[in-house]
């Protein structure tokens, strides 16, 4: 029994040690667009950013399934209720849920396998503004960008007010949505991939689209880099 207690205590101390060593991150979200955006983050909320303004968020260690995006064409009242043309999150300035397509996404998970952060830019929900997602500390230097003018080049059938839809949003078929978990690239995903090779162009585009940095790295997300 004493041996079991010792092992249990050791396990708890080890878990506590790992938890103590894991550090969250600081994200500097910057608007370089020549127009106002309403930055959104889950977790984090939301903030209006005029050109040149920034917003700092501090997600905790172990945060996963998180994303940052820009909303455009928004109007909010004094209570923070309104609507956005792209990226709207249930009509709230302070987002509590993911945004409506089309919107360019910065996605991340902190302190995961081997205490690595995983991050990506995704066009699986379409595109609304150009984006950079880059580490700013920790000796990690590989940043990623999607800077093509996709809205102007968007195929007619994918066009939306203020953005360019992913085909899943428009056609809602397994070929494009990958509901079965078994799908490959399509002509539409190649359209996105050739213009933004660092970004996810369809749900299974993992091999060339997921990047890592050591846990505790800080990052910047730039709209219109």
Curated annotation (Swiss-Prot):
Lineage, top-rank taxon, reads Eukaryota
Signal keyword on record: yes
Q: Report the PTM annotation.
A: N-glycosylated.
* Keywords linked to the UniProt accession: Allergen, Antimicrobial, Disulfide bond, Fungicide, Glycoprotein, Pathogenesis-related protein, Plant defense, Secreted, Signal
Assign the protein's first listed, main location to one coarse class.
secreted
Q: Where in the cell is it found?
A: Secreted
The answer to whether the entry has keyword Nucleus is no
Disulfide pattern: 33-224, 74-84, 89-95, 140-213, 146-196, 154-164, 168-177, 178-183
- Which is one Gene Ontology cellular component term of this protein? extracellular region
Pfam families listed in its UniProt record: Thaumatin (PF00314)
Signal sequence span is 1-24
Q: What does this protein do?
A: Has antifungal activity against B.cinerea, C.comatus, M.arachidicola, P.piricola, C.albicans and S.carlsbergensis. Inhibits HIV-1 reverse transcriptase.
The entry's family comment says: Belongs to the thaumatin family.
Q: What name goes with this protein?
A: Thaumatin-like protein
């Amino acid at each position: 029994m004493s041996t079991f207690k010792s092992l249990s205590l050791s396990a708890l101390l080890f878990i506590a040690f790992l938890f103590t060593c894991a550090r969250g991150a600081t994200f500097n979200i910057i608007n370089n667009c020549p127009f106002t955006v309403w930055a959104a983050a889950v977790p984090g909320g939301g903030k209006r950013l005029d050109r040149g303004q920034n917003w700092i968020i501090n997600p905790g260690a172990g945060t996963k399934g998180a994303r940052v995006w820009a909303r455009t064409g928004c109007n909010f009242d004094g209570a923070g209720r309104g609507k956005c043309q792209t990226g709207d999150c249930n009509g709230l300035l302070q987002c509590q849920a993911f945004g409506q397509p089309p919107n360019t996404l910065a996605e991340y998970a902190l302190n995961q396998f081997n205490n690595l952060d995983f991050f990506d830019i995704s066009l699986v929900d379409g595109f609304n503004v150009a984006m950079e997602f880059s580490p700013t500390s920790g000796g990690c230097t590989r940043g990623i960008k999607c800077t093509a003018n996709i809205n102007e080049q968007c195929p007619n059938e994918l066009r939306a007010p203020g953005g360019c839809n992913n085909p899943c949003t428009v056609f809602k078929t397994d070929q494009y949505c990958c509901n079965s978990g078994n799908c490959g690239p399509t002509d539409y995903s190649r359209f996105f991939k050739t213009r933004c090779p660092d970004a996810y162009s369809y749900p299974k585009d993992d091999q060339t689209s997921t990047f890592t940095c050591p846990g505790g790295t800080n990052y910047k997300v730039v709209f219109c880099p």
